[in-house]
Curated annotation (Swiss-Prot):
The lineage of its organism: Bacteria, Bacillati, Bacillota, Bacilli, Bacillales. GO terms for molecular function: glyceraldehyde-3-phosphate dehydrogenase (NAD+) (phosphorylating) activity; NAD binding; NADP binding. Catalyzes the oxidative phosphorylation of glyceraldehyde 3-phosphate (G3P) to 1,3-bisphosphoglycerate (BPG) using the cofactor NAD. The first reaction step involves the formation of a hemiacetal intermediate between G3P and a cysteine residue, and this hemiacetal intermediate is then oxidized to a thioester, with concomitant reduction of NAD to NADH. The reduced NADH is then exchanged with the second NAD, and the thioester is attacked by a nucleophilic inorganic phosphate to produce BPG. Homotetramer. This is Glyceraldehyde-3-phosphate dehydrogenase 1. It comes from the Bacteria. InterPro entries: GlycerAld/Erythrose_P_DH, GlycerAld_3-P_DH_AS, GlycerAld_3-P_DH_cat, GlycerAld_3-P_DH_NAD(P)-bd, Glyceraldehyde-3-P_DH_1, NAD(P)-bd_dom_sf. SUPFAM superfamilies: Glyceraldehyde-3-phosphate dehydrogenase-like, C-terminal domain (SSF55347), NAD(P)-binding Rossmann-fold domains (SSF51735). The keyword Secreted does not apply. NAD(+) binds at R12, I13, D34, S120, N316. Pathway: Carbohydrate degradation; glycolysis; pyruvate from D-glyceraldehyde 3-phosphate: step 1/5. Its EC number is 1.2.1.12. It comes from Staphylococcus epidermidis (strain ATCC 35984 / DSM 28319 / BCRC 17069 / CCUG 31568 / BM 3577 / RP62A). The keyword Cytoplasm applies.
């Protein structure tokens, strides 16, 4: 029997998750909830500037959509607690609105009858933060609300874990060179949150910004909690980002080849490895949560310490979405 999924919030991540789930056996989206009208949602599902056209058939019908012959109910309910998740026997809600980002708020989906909630954002408070294939084995099935972290944390975590496990990570700094997103202005204008830099034209500027990924990594890999800090530079590309991580290692005399070899050995469906001289457009649509770029590894001895700089690519849309769907499937499987 298929795992029944509802998507709350049919924006960039919600729609791409819908697409991704179509290719995953055993998962079925049965409902979406978004305040936008169905005709617009169907259009944006079918056509996507960065990820390309959806290959399936999409039709608006009364009360929802028909996608590849399957009916999907659509709601425009602003209060998650009033959604009919119990009547629809929803196994997992993929929470993509950005509003239900702590356990107390996400509990509204549980109260409405859903069995589990996966938040597509960093969560506040006592919520397990999962990066699939880094710490998903910490889930035991008892959790009702789980966070899928952020796209940047998903790119950072496997790299940081390898450095910590193999060479000892003392401390470090990360920078994400990040595509612009919907929380930036396309023309110079007052920003809704009063941010003077995000008020500037996203496609024309390199815009310094903050990131919580360095702090959040401690929720994923407790042994490096507090050892990293970081920032972001938003750049004029619509998707396709890069995380640079520079750390002091505990182990001495580490070489570039040793670092790259350790990363290659750790590669899996979530963590890719490449020695090709790629650029950001090459990784758009990629389903690795993080793609280690061996061509950018550098090492330096500073006093009696070893300094290493590494880099990993990620599609801040599809890479993250693929990781979310992996976590969603695992979370639901544990509940069977």
């Amino acid at each position: 029997m298929a795992i029944k999924v509802a998507i709350n919030g049919f924006g960039r991540i919600g729609r791409l998750a819908f697409r991704r789930i179509q290719d995953v056996e055993g998962l079925e989206v049965v409902a979406v909830n978004d305040l936008t009208d169905d005709d617009m949602l169907a259009h944006l599902l079918k056509y996507d500037t960065m990820q390309g056209r959806f290959t399936g058939e999409v039709e608006v019908i009364e009360g929802g959509f028909r996608v590849n012959g399957k009916e999907i109910k659509s709601f425009d309910e602003p209060d998650a607690g009033k959604l009919p998740w119990g009547d629809l026997d929803i196994d997992v809600v993929l929470e993509c609105t950005g509003f239900y980002t702590d356990k107390e708020k996400a509990q509204a989906h549980i109260d409405a009858g859903a069995k589990k909630v996966l938040i597509s954002a960093p969560a506040k408070g006592d919520v397990k933060t999962i990066v699939f294939n880094t710490n998903h084995d910490t889930l035991d099935g008892s959790e009702t609300v789980v966070s899928g972290a952020s796209c940047t944390t998903n790119s950072l975590a496997p790299v940081a874990k390898v450095l910590s496990d193999e060479f000892g990570l003392v401390e470090g700094f990360m920078t994400t060179i990040h595509a612009y997103t919907g929380d930036q202005n396309t023309q110079d204008a007052p920003h809704r949150k009063g941010d003077k830099r995000r008020a500037r034209a996203a496609a024309e500027n390199i815009i310094p910004n903050s990131t919580g990924a360095a702090k959040a990594i401690g929720k994923v890999i407790p042994e490096i909690d507090g050892k990293l800090d970081g920032g972001a530079q938003r750049v004029p590309v619509a998707t396709g980002s890069l995380t640079e991580l520079t750390v002091v290692l505990d182990k001495q005399d580490v070489t570039v080849d040793q670092v790259n070899s350790a990363m290659k050995q750790a590669s899996d469906e979530s963590f890719g490895y490449t020695e090709d001289e790629i650029v950001s457009s090459d990784i758009v649509g990629m389903t690795y949560g993080s793609l280690f770029d061996a061509t950018q590894t550098r090492v330096m001895t500073v006093g009696d310490r070893q300094l290493v700089k590494v880099a990993a690519w990620y599609d801040n849309e599809m890479s993250y979405t693929a990781q979310l769907v992996r976590t969603l499937a695992h979370l639901a499987e544990l509940s069977k």
